[in-house]
């Protein structure tokens, strides 16, 4: 029985005070005047039933709207989930919206079947931690690419620099966020005390709820009152008491009986009266510092270039060539080499793999993908500064991988057979996927990299297995340059000097993927086995 039906029953019970009841219902038939008088309560019943039907019609219209919205996304199968806004809404819908829809309904027979169906697949749906991760990914993109929250809510990617706003990327199809979407992002930040991110997202949620005149949808978890409540306290926490007071007063317009909010209003009024304009002014909120990332400004600045490079005539020492490395393997089909930087020496080999090979590698790796880890002392940990999944492929998995190994060995001149090189690591980046500045080589003698007993990682060979629409560049922090994602190309650099010391200039990062599905394959080659292929040198510059 729905809420409307319960109201109808209450209305019927309320009819007990009618004067006609005093004569007893059992003798209504005995006089026509009593029959006529009985029509009056029926008219009231009709009114109650009409209100119930209208409520049910509104509820069904809302459910139909939700059904049509989700169905339209499934019917358009040509759209890959590469837009971070679309990806966030998919996770939120599966984790939160469906649960709210199903549990908002009453337990009729049909609804019971719907709930049973939901419970059967519930274990396969994203968890709340996934929703939190997707929300943090949007905040990461907001920070690194200086994105405007209002623009993101409309589905556009705009960069904010001072008072100017410029379009950073224009998607072919817009995916806007709802008020409840914005509220959920803001709440994730709010729950960790991150008011720098919470406030703009909650402000946008309030704005969108107001624009909808406070209309609540079945799948929504929050309402205008919720958004006002959270935003008011966030403003108070950063010292903007005037804003907190204004929002709290607005809250009381919609919920005048809320005693907690009434007490807050009195507190804010008292604080303003005692401190005057000192607490009324808006306070500048500092972005939370990232303690493990001391090179944040350089890293983000390089990511914001989206991998744009100077042309070769601007730096004549950079060049392109056909490379055989004196290998018979490459004699008939030399590699297309582009030197993108000299110190450290970074080479980009265009079309190193074919579309078919890149697709095959992705297909081989996909069933084995697991959350990527990083070396921390003697342990390997999952961390927030590396968001991706990875898999390791032995060359015995498919003959194509043996061919790929031969090609890498011919081009680098190095021995890449185990244990002198690691298995091929295939990485798929998630929503806003990134890997903040790091070295590929070990910087500690206790690093797990030494477990292979083949020395440190002397070189990195990284293959781009896909293209992206925006973001995802590889940024070299101390080299002060970045390389864009070039599908099927391979990036090569030396991690160690010939002396065996690590090259500090190879500190690099995978910039967050703004829009796209980024796949890379890494082949890490170790010191041992390369003694005569890359001889040692006492010159620290080599």
UniProtKB/Swiss-Prot annotation:
PROSITE patterns noted in UniProt: FE2OG_OXY
SUPFAM superfamilies assigned to the protein according to its UniProt record, in alphabetical order: TPR-like (SSF48452)
Record's catalysed reaction(s): L-prolyl-[collagen] + 2-oxoglutarate + O2 = trans-4-hydroxy-L-prolyl-[collagen] + succinate + CO2
Carbohydrate attachment residues: 240, 480
Record PTM text: N-glycosylation plays no role in the catalytic activity.
Cofactor field: Fe(2+); L-ascorbate
One Gene Ontology cellular component annotation held by this UniProt entry: endoplasmic reticulum lumen
Keyword check for Methyltransferase: no
Molecular function terms from GO: iron ion binding; L-ascorbic acid binding; procollagen-proline 4-dioxygenase activity
Coiled-coil ranges from the UniProt annotation: 105-129
Signal peptide: 1-24
Keyword tags: Coiled coil, Dioxygenase, Endoplasmic reticulum, Glycoprotein, Iron, Metal-binding, Oxidoreductase, Signal, TPR repeat, Vitamin C
Segments annotated as TPR repeats: 225-258
UniProt keyword Glycoprotein, yes or no: yes
Pfam family, one: P4Ha_N
Residue intervals of the Fe2OG dioxygenase domain: 420-527
Predominant cellular place of this UniProt entry's protein: endoplasmic reticulum
Cofactor note: Binds 1 Fe(2+) ion per subunit.
Annotated InterPro entries: Oxoglu/Fe-dep_dioxygenase_dom, P4HA-like, Pro_4_hyd_alph, Pro_4_hyd_alph_FE2OG_OXY, Pro_4_hyd_alph_N, TPR-like_helical_dom_sf
Annotated localization: Endoplasmic reticulum lumen
Recorded family membership: Belongs to the P4HA family.
Record text on subunit structure and interactions: Heterotetramer of two alpha-3 chains and two beta chains (the beta chain is the multi-functional PDI).
PANTHER family in the cross-refs: PROLYL 4-HYDROXYLASE ALPHA SUBUNIT (PTHR10869), PROLYL 4-HYDROXYLASE SUBUNIT ALPHA-3 (PTHR10869:SF223)
Its biological purpose: Catalyzes the post-translational formation of 4-hydroxyproline in -Xaa-Pro-Gly- sequences in collagens and other proteins.
Protein name: Prolyl 4-hydroxylase subunit alpha-3
Source organism per UniProt: Mus musculus
């Amino acid at each position: 029985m729905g809420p409307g039906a319960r109201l109808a029953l209450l209305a019927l019970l309320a009819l007990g005070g009618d004067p006609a009841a005093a004569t007893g219902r059992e003798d209504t038939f005995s006089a026509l005047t009593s029959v006529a008088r009985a029509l009056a309560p029926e008219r009231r019943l009709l009114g109650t039933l009409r209100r119930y039907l209208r409520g049910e019609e509104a509820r069904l219209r809302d459910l139909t709207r939700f059904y049509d919205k989700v169905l339209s996304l499934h019917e358009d199968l040509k759209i890959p989930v590469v837009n971070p806004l679309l990806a966030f809404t998919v996770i939120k819908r599966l984790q939160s919206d469906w649960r709210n829809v199903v549990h908002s309904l009453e337990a009729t027979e049909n609804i019971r079947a719907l709930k049973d169906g939901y419970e059967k697949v519930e274990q396969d749906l994203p968890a709340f931690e996934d929703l939190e991760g997707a929300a943090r990914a949007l905040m990461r993109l907001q920070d690194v690419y200086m994105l405007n929250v209002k623009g993101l809510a409309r589905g556009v990617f705009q960069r904010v620099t001072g008072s100017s706003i410029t379009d950073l990327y224009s998607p072919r199809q817009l995916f806007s966020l709802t008020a409840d979407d914005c509220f959920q992002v803001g709440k994730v930040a709010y729950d960790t005390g991150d008011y720098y991110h919470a406030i703009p997202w909650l402000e946008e949620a309030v704005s969108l709820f107001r624009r909808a005149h406070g209309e609540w949808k079945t799948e929504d978890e929050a309402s205008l009152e919720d958004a006002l409540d959270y935003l008011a306290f966030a403003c108070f926490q950063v010292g903007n008491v005037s804003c907190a007071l204004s929002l709290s007063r607005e809250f009381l317009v919609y919920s005048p009986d809320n005693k907690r909010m009434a007490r807050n209003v009195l507190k804010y009024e008292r604080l303003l009266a005692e401190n005057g304009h000192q607490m009324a002014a808006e306070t500048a909120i500092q972005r939370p510092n990232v303690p493990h990332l001391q090179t944040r400004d350089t890293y983000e600045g390089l990511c914001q270039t989206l991998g744009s490079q100077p042309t070769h005539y601007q730096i004549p020492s950079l060049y392109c060539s056909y490379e055989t490395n004196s290998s018979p393997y490459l004699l008939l089909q030399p590699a297309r080499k582009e030197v993108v930087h000299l110190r450290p020496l970074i080479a980009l080999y265009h079309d190193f793999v074919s579309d078919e090979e890149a697709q095959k590698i992705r297909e081989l790796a996909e069933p084995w993908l697991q959350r990527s880890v990083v070396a921390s002392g003697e342990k390997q940990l999952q961390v927030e500064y590396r968001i991706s999944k990875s898999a390791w492929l032995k060359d015995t998995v498919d003959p194509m991988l043996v061919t790929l190994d031969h090609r890498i060995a011919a081009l680098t001149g190095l021995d890449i057979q185990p244990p002198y090189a690691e298995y091929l690591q295939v990485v798929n980046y998630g929503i806003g996927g990134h890997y903040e500045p790091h070295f590929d080589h070990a910087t500690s003698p206790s690093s797990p990299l030494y477990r292979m007993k083949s020395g440190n990682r002397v070189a990195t060979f990284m293959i781009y297995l896909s293209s992206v629409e925006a973001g995802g560049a590889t940024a070299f922090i101390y080299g002060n340059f970045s390389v864009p994602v070039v599908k099927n190309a391979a990036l090569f650099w030396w991690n160690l000097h010939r002396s065996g010391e690590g090259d500090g200039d190879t500190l690099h990062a995978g910039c967050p993927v703004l829009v796209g599905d980024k796949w890379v394959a890494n082949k890490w080659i170790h010191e041992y086995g390369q003694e005569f292929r890359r001889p040692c040198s006492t010159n620290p510059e080599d």
